[in-house]
Amino acid sequence: MIDRTRAGVRCRTIRFVRTVEGDLPKDAYGTIRYEIENLGRLLVLVEWDRGFTVPVFPHEIEVVNLANVRL
């Protein structure tokens, strides 16, 4: 199921992340589009400022501004 609770919230990587679209260095910024569970794992789809959109694991990112989270 797609969870859009945090859609539009800014995030950043907390360490180097290698993806199929390209590498994301530590402190790369992006915007969360949605979260989804796939094969028992939670994934977060992020539109990165580097020009591509790829899923990452929640432990690879942190939310930049909690004031934007819609509950």
What are these regions (language model features)?
Residues 69-71:
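Long, low-complexity intrinsically disordered regions
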Residues 2-67:
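Basic/aromatic-rich interaction segments and small domains that mediate binding to polyanionic partners
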